[in-house]
Amino acid sequence: MLSFQQFPTVALLWLLGVALRLTILAMPAVVALIRDDLHLSATEIGIVTGLPVALFAIAAVPGALLIARLGVLSALLCGLLITAVGSALRSASGDIATLYATTTLMGLGVAIMQPALPPLVRLWSTGHVGFGTAVYTNGLLVGEILPVAFTAPLLALIGGGWRAGLIVWSLPVLVIAVLVAKCAPRGQPEAPERSRWWPDWSDGPIWQLGLMFGGITSMYFTTNGFLPVYLSSIGRSDMIGSALTALNLGQMPASLLLLAVADRIVRHVWPYVLAGIVALASVGVLVATSGPAIVAASAMLGFCCGGILTLALALPAVLCAPEDVARTSAAVFALSYGCAVLVPIISGAAWDLTGVPRSAFFPIACCALLPLLLAPRINFRGIA
């Protein structure tokens, strides 16, 4: 564990994790209000909610270029400010084109932040990369929960509709940017001189890490997207709320557990393989039953996704040389979020082509196989 004297650094890492998701999850919490106000179609809603994930893939490598040119901390601050401004500007949208543009700006900011965090964790928590990653991943998960849980009572308290809600959830990101600028540890090199930024796409480990991480993100996003309509199709609409809550809150126990043990297990194959096996079994239970076991399986799938997510986020900083962490992280994010865009499309096509609702979960099951197949091939005894 980090020492008590490093608590402010730990707090900053946690807050940065919160900032990664706070503004993104503010949109689903008010999207119904936006739909009614701007008269959005279902396709337009799909595009505006999918834009951030697409930006995570498209802008990850350019984010590594910014890190190489400005340094890790400066690039991170740029990402925070762009995220806060873009998110707040969404509130001024009077039409779908403006909403697309401001959402793209916000997604670009987050896409810059994501590859900056692994090298920052390596700088700020030397020797405890697993713990540092678990800290900011826990913040990320909290950042996913807060807008969903508190937007409705917040809007009832302050009034102002969806526009006020988007502004309110942008303000903490701006505050976090100020705290990082004032309180971030100094005296460490932000980036090596003449730092390389373009990933080495011929490097096998990049593809292994990217596809393994892609399996995790795809399982999570695709299950969130298809579980409600699947339950509705089998006549269990009554379980939608409890199953989604179990899926998303199931990540939190894994994150808390890894705060204690991440440093000890991040370099071992078995956690990834075990989580893959349990995730695969959970998907099987989801499609094979129609009772309360669905909620339990959703919770276990969320636990596995949260656990592998935390460990996989640490791997670039654990396995790569310091000068390669940012560009490797960018490549991993580009590959993983590219998968997260494609797999839901494949799941939807499988359902449409077969007419069988369960078929949408076959690509999700294939994603669960990726940790099983790829983790044993990764050299976990790489650079410390």
Residue ranges and their predicted role:
Residues A68-L80, D263-G276:
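Cytoplasmic membrane-interface "Motif A"-like loop-to-helix N-cap segments
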Residues T102-G139:
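Cytoplasmic helix-loop-helix junction between adjacent transmembrane helices
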Residues G127-F131, V135-P185:
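Helix-loop-helix hairpin linking two adjacent transmembrane segments in secondary transporters
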Residues A317-V356, I364:
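A late C-terminal transmembrane helix in Major Facilitator Superfamily
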